[in-house]
Structure formats: C-alpha cells, structure tokens
C-alpha cells in the first residue's frame, strides 16, 4: 500500500487521500507519518461526550462529528491520511462508518486519488464507504496459500457486487522477481488476472526490521522500479 501511494504522489498528478481501513493500522509507519488520533478513537470520544452531555451547546451531533473528523485528518506535504483504527468499547463501527462515508463525500472532490488499505474482509468497501472503486489491487506473497487466500477475496468481491473498474493480482516478495510454476498454476486455476510480480527486496526488508519508512527508499530501488512498471501497465 505504501509503495503504491509513493508512486501516485511521485507523479504529481494531483492530491492523494490515504485511508487506512485496517484495524491493525500501520500504514503510517510505511509512509513515515505520525498518527495522533483515529476514527475509532473519535467514536469513543463521541460516545463519551454524548453520554456525559459534554457536546458543546449549540453544536449538533453532526457538527461535533465533523469537527472531530477534522482532527483525524493528517495533512502531509505529499498526501492526506485518515486512520480508521480500532474501537475500544462495546458496539459496532456503524456510526463511525457513517461519519466517514458522509465526510468522504465532502472531501473526495478535492482529491485526484483515494487509496484505501483494507482488511481481507473488505468491510468498509462492502458498507459503501467509497462510492466506487476504479482499481482493486489484490496483494499476495509468492505462495500457493497466499494465492488461494486472494482467490477467496476475489470471490467475495464478486458476491458483493462491487464491480471495480479493474481488478488484478500483484505477487509480492518473489525470489529474483520470478514466479514459481506451482504458484503460476494456482493463479491460472482460480482465473485471477496477474498485474505483475514484485521481487523480494532486501532494502524493504531492512526498513521493516529497523522501523524505517520503505516509501522513502530511492526511486532506483528494485521493488519501486517493478511497481512503477506495473502501475504504468494498468494506467495508474
């Protein structure tokens, strides 16, 4: 996800909004930005404010939600970012998702690209958080089991009737950037469209181990070069 975002802002075609919709949020670490609050935390704050009656007088719940939403929007030089985070108390994400959906509706026209990093369950896309998905990237490691897991996600996307403009598979961390015959056979077995293959990259691995943002690696990095070619081939 971080590398894709890096490629988009590097092209300078317009502003990018990043939505980290994975409950185990860490995309900000890949991008090298600090997260002070998440929409999950805001949900808890709003619930407590409503319970204790501390929503400012003269301010509706919707106004308060919009104000708090602004607190969660991270504005970086290269992109803006929202983190869904996790809810700590009981209850569901329904209201937070509603806030996210309504606020995104207001913010979307300001961005050329919106990139959402999802959990495998695709809950936020299924709930209509985004009005339409132009490109769905399915990411798997270079293993048969990884491809099988992605194939199940592809089935879910079809069952949900999401109909993205284009959808395809990117294989990550392939030794020497090459597919094993067994993995290729598994891809063909499930009828998955292969967008491309990314090589195992020692520099990316070191960034992960050392806690450094891999998106800041030089443009000559092998994984960045490979991803740039894939994105050009699919019109991004």
Task: Name these PLM-found stretches.
Residues 21-24, 173-175, 201:
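Residues in the short beta-alpha loop(s) of Rossmann-like NAD(P)-binding domains
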Residues 226-236:
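C-terminal alpha-helix
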Residues 6-77:
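N-terminal phosphate/diphosphate-binding loop that engages ATP/GTP or pyrophosphate donors
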Residues 210-221:
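C-terminal boundary of histidine-terminating zinc-finger modules
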Residues 95-197, 206:
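Conserved catalytic-core segment of NTP-binding enzymes
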Residues 60-76, 80-116:
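Cytosolic-facing regulatory segments adjacent to core modules
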Residues 18, 79-81, 194-197:
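Conserved beta-strand scaffold positions in the cores of enzyme catalytic domains, especially
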Residues 1-2:
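Glycine-rich phosphate-binding P-loop
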């Amino acid at each position: 996800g971080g590398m894709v975002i890096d490629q988009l802002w590097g092209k300078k075609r317009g502003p990018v909004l990043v939505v980290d919709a994975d409950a185990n949020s860490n995309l900000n670490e890949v991008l090298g930005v600090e997260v002070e609050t998440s929409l999950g935390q805001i949900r808890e704050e709003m619930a407590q404010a409503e319970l204790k009656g501390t929503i400012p007088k003269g301010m509706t719940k919707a106004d308060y939600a919009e104000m708090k939403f602004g607190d969660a929007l991270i504005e970086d030089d290269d992109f803006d970012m929202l983190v869904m985070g996790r809810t700590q108390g009981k209850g569901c994400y329904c209201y937070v998702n509603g806030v996210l959906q309504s606020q995104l509706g207001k913010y979307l026209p300001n961005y050329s690209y919106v990139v959402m990093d999802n959990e495998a369950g695709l809950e936020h896309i299924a709930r209509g958080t985004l009005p339409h998905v132009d490109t769905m990237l399915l990411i798997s490691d270079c293993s048969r089991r990884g491809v099988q897991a992605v194939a199940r996600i592809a089935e879910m996307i079809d069952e949900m009737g999401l109909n993205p403009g284009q959808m395809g598979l990117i294989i990550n961390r392939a030794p020497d950037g090459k597919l094993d015959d067994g993995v290729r056979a598994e891809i063909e077995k499930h009828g998955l469209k292969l967008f491309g293959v990314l090589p195992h990259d020692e520099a990316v691995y070191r960034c992960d181990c050392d806690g450094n943002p891999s998106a800041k690696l030089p443009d000559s990095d092998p994984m960045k070069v490979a991803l740039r070619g894939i994105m050009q081939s699919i019109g991004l």
